[in-house]
Amino acid sequence: MNNMNINEMLKQAKKMQSEIELKEKELYKKEFTIEKQGLTLVLNGKREVLKIDINEALVDPEDKDILEDLLLLAFNEAMEKIDEAHKEIEKQIPSGKLPF
């Protein structure tokens, strides 16, 4: 290989890295909203919980266990959606193969 080919490959690798970083930044800004029977949970692509909204009807002290279960279900579903979004980004990366 000559220097021209190596330089071109390095440029392609840098371009690919920039594209991945841009997609990650877009994902981090994206919000994922999950609703479960009066409970709304909002997370961002960094897996940070941004908001929890609980319908007043769910706040009855006798319903504490139900509320906790709903929170758990909503949170886990949100995490699955975020993981799916991360996998979509990974699919766009040539399976660990750089152009050299």
Curated annotation (Swiss-Prot):
Cell compartment(s), UniProt: Cytoplasm, Nucleoid
DNA-binding found in the keyword field: yes
GO cellular component: bacterial nucleoid; cytosol
Matches recorded under InterPro entries: YbaB-like_sf (IPR036894), YbaB/EbfC (IPR004401)
Coiled coil, from the record: none
SUPFAM superfamilies: YbaB-like (SSF82607)
An annotated Gene Ontology molecular function: DNA binding
Pfam families per UniProt: YbaB_DNA_bd (PF02575)
Protein family per UniProt: Belongs to the YbaB/EbfC family.
Job of this protein: Binds to DNA and alters its conformation. May be involved in regulation of gene expression, nucleoid organization and DNA protection.
NCBIfam families: DNA_YbaB_EbfC
Subunit field text: Homodimer.
Descriptive protein name: Nucleoid-associated protein MYPU_0500
Lineage: Bacteria, Bacillati, Mycoplasmatota, Mycoplasmoidales, Metamycoplasmataceae
